[in-house]
Each structure stands twice: as C-alpha cells, then as structure tokens.
C-alpha cells in the first residue's frame, strides 16, 4: 500500500476540484488551512494509582456556514495530520448535504483496549475539561468516531454540563448520545442507511435494477454490517462477499449478514464462515460484482489495483478509500463512484437531526428520521450527479464543486473574502 499523508491528500483533492470552479486564490488558500488547531495534554489517574498523560487534538477547519461538527477518535496511531484531513473532509461533507455546519474532528493518541472502563471514563472527562472552552452547541459539536461510542459521549456531555453549570442546551453539545440523554432514533444505522440511499440513486442514474445484483462490502464494523444488511433487505441485493481486518469470505449464492455478524462475534472474525470461501481483502475488491462498498480504512483502492476493479458502482462508505490517482483510473473504466463525503454523510446528517431535536426539546420517530434522511441524501446525490454530468467531471470533483461553492459563498457573504 502506498503511504500518503492524509492532509496532503485532502489538499490535493481540493486543488484538483478548484480547477472546475470560479474561486479566488485567497479563498482557496484559506480553505487549505484549518481555522483552529488545538493540541492538549490529557493527564488521568490510572487504576494502579499512577498518572499517565495522553495527547489530544481538536481541529476546526471552517465555520463559515455554522458551528463545526465532527467525531472524536481514540486510536494508538492517531496523528494531527489525520485529524486535520478528517476535519477538512467534514467541511465538505456537511456542505454537500447542505447542513448548517462547518467541519471539525478530534482525537486522542491512545489504545482504548488497554484501558479499563473507569480509565476510559476518566479520559473522556479529562479531554472535555481540556477542550470545553472551544466546543459547545453553537461552536463545535463532537460525536463518536473510531473506538468511541454513545456511552463515552454520555460521559463527555455530562462533564461539559457540569463545567458549564447546566447553562443552555447541554444535550446539544455532543451527538451520538444514548437515547435516554438526548440521542436520536436511527443514529446507529445512519451512515449505512445514507449510503444505501445513494447506491439506490446511483443505480437509477445508470438504469440498473439492483434486485438480485451482487454487492461486496469491505469492512464489517457498524457501517459495513448495516450496509450489507440494508442492501439485502431494502434493495434486494445479493451480498456475495464481506471482510474484516483479518480477511474476507465469499459465496456467489449470497451471505446472510446477520448470521455472518453472529459468527464474527463468536469467533472474532468473519473468516471460516460455514459455506463460504476465505478470501483476502485485496481479492474482495477485485470481485465480479455490481456494487463495491469499501467500508473499512483509507487508501485501499490505489493506482496499483484500480485497473482490476470490476464493479459498476463504487460506494465509498469509508473515509478516503480511493486515492486521487485511482480516481482517474476508475473514471476511465466507466465506474461510477459515490465519493466518501457524500456516500457516508448519513451519519452526520442524523447527528444534525439529533442536535435539532436537542435544541428544540422535541423528538422524532425512527420513520421520521429515515424519511428526512432519504430526502437529504437523495437531493444531495442528484446535485452532485448533475454537476458531474453538466461539467463532465469526476463525481468526487463534482461533490467538491457543490460543497466548496457553498462554503465559498458563505465566506463572501460574511465579508471574509472580497472575491
């Protein structure tokens, strides 16, 4: 795999899209840099009485369109470059689906598997104490991400509320919370559900009837599992392959996503699932399928393997699974890509719905959430697809044009840039 600096990749994608826009050089230079970067030391007492200091980040890329929004990642290999890149991509993600937000992202360099639950709670609360003055319902709204979850969001929300002495709508400071403290119905499946809506619309654009067509899903975490499950249940597709970090499985007659999940929980991996053939993650990407959904990690489709991709639609459920060089190859092959910050925007869209519900103190049914998400994702897909057709440019570039144009307009209307 080619090692590419994540933030350099984000800037490269922006520069590429700028070729198709009438955007001033000063605005472009501004958009290449986050507006705020916070690095903090997060000391906590460990269960054995010792004190350990962790490094944390919070990056706010651009708030021209509203408060910044983005998850908090706990990962042993977390880097500032990754957090900056993800905050930048969040700006485009919230803009492409027309949410009144900017992009943010947070992270802590930690292996949470090495912490007890009590240590995790201390870390969550200590992080909020370190960054509370730069977050808030009207400023920057975190959410769960890699190795963080609703329970951790609950602790963080409670710590923020304690510090602020319960002034204002504290529930709205963080999304992805447990239902009992302001969480939203539909949040758990939101990323995958949004991706399914875009896959459905992409098939319409290509004139493909998805019923009985084949899909392969790389990655079997929350997003990967629900993408497979909903593709089967809502679109009538045949799930022929799935994988996790240890490898994948293939059955041309179809897999039952629920049974595979049960197997993974019992055995730690999808590998060796009865009735399926073990395959590598690399082999999964190159299968003869109609839809390929990379839902795991960054940079899995590169210039080295892009020419071997056989899917008609590549739905980027993960962040950054296709490199810029591979983008060109896939387009030359006539493959329709649903770019990551459009395809996986369902999660942040339902996070926005959660925030709206928190601010108003009124909660929607799961069906209402799904209907509102469908409208948002469908509208966003066709805005991007029509831009792609009108300008004869790549779908990712089209998504950037739609998103960056909205941010650029907000910057001009605020008087930040004159042209």
UniProtKB/Swiss-Prot annotation:
Active site: 105
Family named by the database record: Belongs to the Glu/Leu/Phe/Val dehydrogenases family.
Gene: gdhA
Protein name: Glutamate dehydrogenase
Keywords noted in UniProt: NAD, NADP, Oxidoreductase
A UniProt-annotated Pfam family: ELFV_dehydrog_N
Coiled coil feature spans: none
Alphabetized GO MF terms: glutamate dehydrogenase (NAD+) activity; glutamate dehydrogenase (NADP+) activity
Entry keyword Signal: no
Gene3D superfamilies: Leucine Dehydrogenase, chain A, domain 1, NAD(P)-binding Rossmann-like Domain
Species this protein is from: Thermococcus profundus
CDD domains noted in UniProt: NAD_bind_1_Glu_DH (cd01076)
Reactions that this protein is recorded to catalyse: L-glutamate + NAD(+) + H2O = 2-oxoglutarate + NH4(+) + NADH + H(+); L-glutamate + NADP(+) + H2O = 2-oxoglutarate + NH4(+) + NADPH + H(+)
BP GO annotations: glutamate catabolic process
UniProt binding sites for NAD(+): 219-225
Subunit and interaction comment: Homohexamer.
């Amino acid at each position: 795999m080619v090692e590419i600096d994540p933030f350099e990749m984000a800037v490269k994608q922006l520069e590429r899209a700028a070729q198709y826009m009438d955007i001033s050089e000063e605005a472009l230079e501004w958009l290449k840099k986050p507006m705020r970067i916070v690095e903090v030391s997060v000391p906590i007492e460990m269960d054995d009485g010792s004190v350990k200091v962790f490094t944390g980040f919070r990056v706010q890329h651009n708030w021209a369109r509203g408060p910044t929004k983005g998850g908090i990642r706990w990962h042993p290999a977390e880097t500032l470059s990754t957090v900056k890149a993800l905050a930048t991509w969040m700006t485009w993600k919230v803009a492409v689906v027309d949410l009144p937000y900017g992009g943010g992202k947070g992270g802590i360099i930690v292996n949470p598997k090495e912490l007890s639950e009590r240590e995790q709670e201390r870390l969550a609360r200590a992080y909020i104490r370190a960054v509370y003055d730069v977050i808030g319902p009207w400023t920057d709204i975190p959410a769960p991400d890699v190795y963080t979850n609703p329970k951790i969001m609950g602790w963080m929300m409670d710590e923020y509320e304690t510090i602020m002495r319960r002034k204002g709508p504290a529930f709205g400071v963080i999304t992805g919370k447990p239902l009992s403290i302001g969480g939203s119905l539909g949040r758990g499946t939101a990323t995958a559900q949004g991706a399914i809506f875009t896959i459905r619309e992409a098939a319409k654009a290509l004139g493909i009837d998805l019923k009985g067509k084949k899909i392969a899903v790389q990655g079997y975490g929350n997003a990967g599992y629900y993408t497979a499950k909903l593709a089967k249940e809502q679109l009538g597709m045949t799930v022929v392959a799935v994988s996790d970090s240890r490898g994948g499985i293939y059955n041309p007659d179809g897999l039952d996503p629920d049974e595979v999940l049960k197997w993974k929980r019992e055995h730690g991996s999808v590998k060796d699932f009865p009735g399926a053939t073990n395959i590598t993650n690399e082999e999964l990407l190159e299968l003869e399928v109609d839809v390929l959904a990379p839902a795991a990690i960054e940079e899995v489709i590169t210039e080295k393997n892009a020419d071997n991709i056989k899917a008609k639609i590549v739905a980027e459920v993960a962040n950054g699974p296709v490199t810029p060089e591979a983008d060109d190859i896939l387009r030359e092959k006539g493959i329709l890509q649903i770019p990551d910050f459009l395809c996986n925007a369902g999660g942040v869209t339902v996070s926005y719905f959660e925030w709206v519900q928190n601010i108003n103190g009124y909660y929607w049914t799961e069906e209402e959430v799904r209907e509102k998400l469908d409208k948002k994702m469908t509208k966003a897909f066709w805005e991007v697809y029509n831009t792609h057709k009108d300008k004869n440019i790549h779908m990712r570039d089209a998504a950037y044009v739609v998103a960056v144009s909205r941010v650029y307009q907000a910057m001009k209307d605020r008087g930040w840039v004159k042209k």
